[in-house]
């Protein structure tokens, strides 16, 4: 044998004799158990046996080994549990066991060895059991390449037995030959050795202290050891040539114990292949193939020089040790992945000199405070710094410039509790912020927007600090202490101070990227005129998108957004067509100007000039006001002073436009006549200093602009006035400029040159300021409450402006400016939403999370779709004559308020499940002290389920092209209503589309889809959304908004997922030279002859759709005649060929590269509505299963939603499309598939009750086809194999293979979806239920089910009506009876989430008849094709349904009743499946003939 050549040392002494002692007994129930202690050398263990076990052992030994029959003490029946008998028997049994051990001193018989647990604890028994196991399964294990797990005790037993030098088969049983083990270990590749921490089993054996030798393994590629003492493990070094992966856990105190066990024998050693620098005692071979080493969870305190022996290592895991310093890793040139988490590292100085090529570095759970040592790890891709002590944000700068870094984790550091922690950290990465995944959370669009703002803020601060450094001395000489003008350097950060635990809303500054073309072309913002440090700001967003030529940023960004027609150059001079009636009156902020900030020196110089001119014009009024305030302060009381200030304020505020030049000259001449010029100048200077806190000359020459805010402004002074504005915050006050409405659609140069000064006021005239809506609307009250400015802009800029304004006031003055009516900067939009929903008593309002809020105008008005004879809907929309303002007044205000109300913006606030429409009250704010819950009552809320909100598919044929339409107008379909949303801020439309599409895609279960009535009117082609979201159709219409004080209930069974209306295939196949279809106009920036953007189907493989798929879907698209249909389903059923594929991709598909695989018509039942069976068109794709449902389900669930939005109207009735409900079950959510008896139906089960649906195909062929296609699709969803070699991942590749095999009627698919088929137990349950309902089950022979089919019972219609309704039934045919049952298809078998059994039984017997009582069978085509009428003789003596009286078969309204006079009972049954129908007739005729001796009469009727 192979063992003959093995030698582990001299032969050991003879083994000590084994002993077995009975040390006690226990009474268990009614019998006694004897406790036996077995000793084998130093090892001992305890076992328990009752007397009957001894008796069985003795019988087998007598039979096999012929021992003395009287050796075992006799059995006693009476008094067997008496104490005296038990004690005597203990002694006798101990003598018996000792005798057996002496009889068999070397090798115990097999039965005795198992009785004494030798196979678990004794050396020979352990090796014999292992050898027998490998004899039977060894080849199978080696062939499968699976991991073989072995215990240290087994390895110890093998080592000990080899060292004893005994024969390899001492027992004489060839199966237990030690050679089987050695043959197996020589070829094994994947080994796992797992010990235990404490004693093993009932023994005193501590496995972690047992020595063993691994040199018997000759071909190891991968080994894992845990809870073994590395000092006692020998022979592992013999696997150096082949071992590629090694894991040693809970076993080592140093790396040398594992990598250089020879180090304990040699003082000086060097790795093989290195140049020897001095005397050494040994040259040790390296680990030639080792690339992965896991030494985690040990007690390693240093990375010693043993790493020199693993030069090819790529993956090194030293986590959960005690490493203090990163050292010696410079020898690992191939190291790519290093895990040093949860050690004791406190410094990383010089770590880049030791980790040159590392891509993944895990430093979590250490004591790190500084990251400066990481700044040169240029190859780093993944960095984990969780659970450290990093406090300063500046530390992130050390890794901010690493060019390859993609994933960073900083959670559970002191740094992570900073407000806006994510955006501030991301801003440290500069232009690469979009590529960084922070804390395992992908960077969102809103975070990138905030990062851009923070970068711009930082750049502005840098520029500001440079400018202030040159003028600091001048400013200090002339600034008075009473009016701090310049924001102190110690002011807090101005980013949005929201809580880190609350999701921030979408920050609306993305529009900066849309003005880069104009900004670069403008003479005011040309990069040539900017300082070198400022040039990156003007192109920040452009650079972040790549080095694109000028003019392409806006167009390409717009093309990537669903709902956007295309990018339009701001300089494009094409005439605008009014998108909605009265749209010329709409006030909006153009996006061509928001790129001009306080860092643009030319722009700032122009603003300074305008402000200086305005101050000179307003100087007399300010001087007069200052003088009067001084006099009032000294002579009059507080009330008179307020009255005079009010009079003065009326004369000095809101001066519009530049004054006449002649007036200025005349005024100047009059002043010279009244006073001496020098005295007047002195008086003006002193008064201005008193009023503004600044020297006049310095003010006029050095106006310091702190912040420029482009915004939408609502000014309330008795009446409401709205205009697009530019607010300029200076160190003395605030200046307001208006963008003339007629100029808002021009180029940026035109807009900037036409800026009109409105008014300005010093800081001292500001009485209150705060947020009407946190992060959305800032309010400034100027001197008197009726003069109020409502500032609407994006959150980041508003907070920046608010923070800069606060810094202009001393802390003691801020308390006077805070308002109890307004919110402070510390309140988040999420908190405001929670308070608002609580005020309106919305259920679950505290759980709602704001995903974005957008100011819009909402318009609704009637429009009529006029269809031509050719069926072309494009361009045939007639708008009712109305103006925008009147439309908004009618829709948004009560009739009594319509005359007083102006067209003011609303806010669309998106949450995960709802679209919230918020209307704010912009009436004059009350004075201080009159706060009485005004901030709650001043908002009106209307909520619409997001599942009912769609982008209007008719948008392409109703909305003209143009910059205004592209950037501000979006048409929605809310329920059955058409609503036009006009966004007042730039780029907000595109943010809304991004968030809307993400939320729609995340909705579960039910969603609303649009199905075009005519292929020519299908939703237009749109580009894919960035981030892989599905394309959506656009919106067009004017709709009146109605408000409801409470939330509208969401449709059950669940909310809807996104309606993915991808482009139609007909457009995809258009030739390159063909003009773009009317529904998909080419982008404005493209040449006139250019083709429209490639539709979504261009993403899928070229062979899709194949001709076979087109043909099969056409053949399968045949709706059964018995299923009720609605117009939308009728339309689908009429489609043929490629039109079906087009419908799927234009209206149903979720993602761009999704492919349709199968189509099925069936009725379905949902878990939440078990009593409702509804028709559905089932579409199986590569991503999900879609159920397009009958409109009856919508009516069933929409009763509580019959509000303004959900009432059908002429707009919808005349529209070129249908609105349908679609249930979506994503394949990733699918957990199990239950197949019904005889394949008559199947149930798809997800993770929740809303994701359980049963398809009642009532046809085994249809069920089989669907399941076959489903398995094929699921197979394509299997996880892709690891790119590493197979040998690297033996845990997953060679683990437990339990998929793809049928066990207990369950098939675990390779995708982990469980397919459950009917078991014999299920058939037995059905048989039992039927048998129990029979009159005398005992007298009847055993039932044998011949046929089980899902059918319908035709109910006899009332007179004057058409064909009777169908009632679902289960028809069961046995050898002698036929039954009709009511079956629960949806609740059984119980889903895993079910906590209690259903209220209904699975089967309820409705009727039963004997086959011999069947008189004849009638087959006709009226009212249903080939419906069967089974005519029975109603005999009195039949033994079925004995408990049911004849009244059961009497005439009842809508019931089956009797067919006529006489003693006959008729069952009118409709079987949809022709195959099942023929099988029923065939089996019924055969059984009837066997029972009655003649052929069954089958008659054909009309």
Swiss-Prot record:
Subunit and interaction comment: Homooligomer. Interacts with GRB2. Interacts with PIK3R1; probably associates with the PI3-kinase complex. Interacts with IRS4. Found in a complex with ITGA5 and PAK1. Found in a complex with LIMK1 and PAK1. Interacts with ITGA5 (via cytoplasmic domain); this interaction is direct. Interacts with PAK1 (via kinase domain); this interaction is direct and is increased upon activation of PAK1. Interacts with LIMK1 (via PDZ and kinase domain); this interaction is direct. Interacts with LIMK2; this interaction depends on LIMK2 activity. Interacts with RAC1 (activated state).
Region of interest: Interaction with LIMK: 659-867
LRR-type repeats, residues: 289-310, 312-333, 334-355, 357-378, 379-400, 404-425
Keyword Repeat: yes
Residues bearing the modification Phosphoserine: 542, 544, 547, 1282
Region (Necessary for binding to phosphoinositide-3-P): 1-134
Comment field on protein domains: Both the presence of the PX domain and the coiled coil region are necessary for its endosomal targeting.
Protein name in the entry: Nischarin
Main location: membrane
Limits of the PX domain: 12-122
Pfam families xref list: PX
A GO biological process held by the record: norepinephrine secretion
Gene Ontology terms for molecular function: identical protein binding; integrin binding; phosphatidylinositol binding
Gene3D superfamilies hit by this protein: Phox-like domain, Ribonuclease Inhibitor
Polar residues biased stretches: 540-549
Localization per record: Cell membrane; Cytoplasm; Early endosome; Recycling endosome
Region Interaction with ITGA5, annotated ranges: 707-805
Function: Acts either as the functional imidazoline-1 receptor (I1R) candidate or as a membrane-associated mediator of the I1R signaling. Binds numerous imidazoline ligands that induces initiation of cell-signaling cascades triggering to cell survival, growth and migration. Its activation by the agonist rilmenidine induces an increase in phosphorylation of mitogen-activated protein kinases MAPK1 and MAPK3 in rostral ventrolateral medulla (RVLM) neurons that exhibited rilmenidine-evoked hypotension.
Compositional bias segments (type: Acidic residues): 637-648, 660-683
